[in-house]
Amino acid sequence: MQGKKPGGSSGGGRSGELQGDEAQRNKKKKKKVSCFSNIKIFLVSECALMLAQGTVGAYLVSVLTTLERRFNLQSADVGVIASSFEIGNLALILFVSYFGARGHRPRLIGCGGIVMALGALLSALPEFLTHQYKYEAGEIRWGAEGRDVCATNGSSSDEGPDPDLICRNRTATNMMYLLLIGAQVLLGIGATPVQPLGVSYIDDHVRRKDSSLYIGILFTMLVFGPACGFILGSFCTKIYVDAVFIDTSNLDITPDDPRWIGAWWGGFLLCGALLFFSSLLMFGFPQSLPPHSDPGMESEQAMLPEREYERPKPSNGVLRHPLEPDSSASCFQQLRVIPKVTKHLLSNPVFTCIVLAACMEIAVVAGFAAFLGKYLEQQFNLTTSSANQLLGMTAIPCACLGIFLGGLLVKKLSLSALGAIRMAMLVNLVSTACYVSFLFLGCDTGPVAGVTVRYGNNSARGSALDPYSPCNNNCECQTDSFTPVCGADGITYLSACFAGCNSTNLTGCACLTTVPPENASVVPGKCPSPGCQEAFLTFLCVMCVCSLIGAMAQTPSVIILIRTVSPELKSYALGVLFLLLRLLGFIPPPLIFGAGIDSTCLFWSTFCGEQGACVLYDNVVYRYLYVSIAIALKSFAFILYTTTWQCLRKNYKRYIKNHEGGLSTSEFFASTLTLDNLGRDPVPAHQTHRTKFIYNLEDHEWCENMESVL
């Protein structure tokens, strides 16, 4: 006994020393773990970056008309600026998504954010490289109080600058225009890695059942960005464009004056700063987060085997993926694989259908929402600022809430692939019904002198309509601008000049022949339509419901997509998704909606002898065509959702689900399905408290294409 004590004591001492050393090493490891090893911190950083991205994109839209007036641009030029972002994004998205999955994703995202910040700063640069704005040269014919009135006997023929000079300036090549295009291309290039790499990074480091919630939060912030962008645009355009260079107290115009140009450049500087600082956070995250980096995750994972989170995910649960990039291959060889990988993804009917369905859903948003402000102005006689303010405070926040609720429902209900696609189908049907109701919510154009009715309120059609009448022939009225006025006779006139008003107080209007001369006056704005206010309130409520419900389909669609490809192709699959979203969902729809809206025009403005913008629409035809295009796209999306559901459903042999939710990918392939036990009975009953199903593979390609059907 005594002989053993020294040995035992020595052994115990060595054991204690080893345990002490191990404890010290563990303490050092714990001390080395930083906040950047937490996926939730990455989520916050990614949300900040996507919020800034959404803000700068919407801000550009909010100041497009300001840019048009500031740099004498035409509408086609402004359209090119708006589409330059997508061009820059399309140029690199496939390459970044493919090679980025093998690189340091957080750093690539951070680099993209810095490039976006540079693009935002360059967007503001034209204001500092050009001359100061001279609003006296901004208009050709305006009265002393900024109103277009009848000018008889050439009383204002010598007012203002030479019209020919203004026309030449407006059509001249503008280097600032090219700089704006280059800045937007940079913004598009910088945005390339943010979404696909960010989504795949989050999905790789959270539990399967939590992935939908995290991704839902991510896209909620992306959609919330436009609300911030519109609000920022409303604020900046109320500040004079050269406020930092001149004393604004000497200005004799206000933001309500059509000659006013706001400080459009200020928002780009603010967005650039936000993009830069949110990008810096990305450089602190590791290439791959350590397991159990979140202390609160262990208790949540207790119901699942711990080994699921300690070992790497299999490529497809059966074999190494044949298209997995080989790190030893040269860059040229890897580039040659990209077409094969793309073909491989598109040969998966589930992947293809869900991507096309997402494109149709985004097409509705990109087309319908792009002209929604204009639609509210035309249908319900709202001002531009009021329309943008309502959109920023109602429809966009509801869409944000819908995306978040969609991700939350997928998580709480533990929806499988079939459950998620059923949810998308149901959401699509309800939102389509909301769009159908829009067909009946609107206002008529009303009587407009010389356009829908003759002067004197006599109905007429076709060639009998002419805005020029004997009562205003000598007024030299121009159609380069649209400043409608409502006459005491209840008829809308294109301007006070077309109403024959010879005074800036809008009295003595010769064309109001149905009222006594002393009452022949007009007030600014269109004449109100009966019942329009009630229709607008109903439209606003239905729009909120439609935005809320329609947005709930986004997260289930993304979840289905990333579950139908192998993990090593996840980032590239998301890149293909965002590529097709831009090719099919963002670029064509505004052109289609815009062409359809232009076809309903009743009266076009003219500038410098050329056709300008439409100033008056047939509201009924406008409403039917505008809403019908959206309904057609939503219906096509429903057909694609149904096809996806059929592709999944016909390949199930058995689907059994209990109360505890989803079976992880590794558990599914490791415990219930391999190439050796295909056709055999599933794992015995000791595998309880899990979602179980046997997936009836039609061929080996389905095994490679479908990582899981959770």
From Swiss-Prot:
Catalytic activity: L-thyroxine(out) = L-thyroxine(in); prostaglandin E1(out) = prostaglandin E1(in); prostaglandin E2(out) = prostaglandin E2(in); prostaglandin F2alpha(out) = prostaglandin F2alpha(in)
Keyword Disulfide bond in record: yes
Region entry Disordered, spans: 1-25
GO cellular component, one term: plasma membrane
GO molecular function: oligopeptide transmembrane transporter activity; organic anion transmembrane transporter activity; prostaglandin transmembrane transporter activity
Composition skew (Gly residues), residue ranges: 1-15
One family name in Pfam for this protein: OATP
Membrane protein topology class: Multi-pass membrane protein
Membrane-side (Cytoplasmic) residue stretches: 1-40, 101-106, 204-222, 287-344, 411-414, 563-571, 649-705
Family matches, as Gene3D superfamilies: MFS general substrate transporter like domains
Protein name as catalogued: Solute carrier organic anion transporter family member 3A1
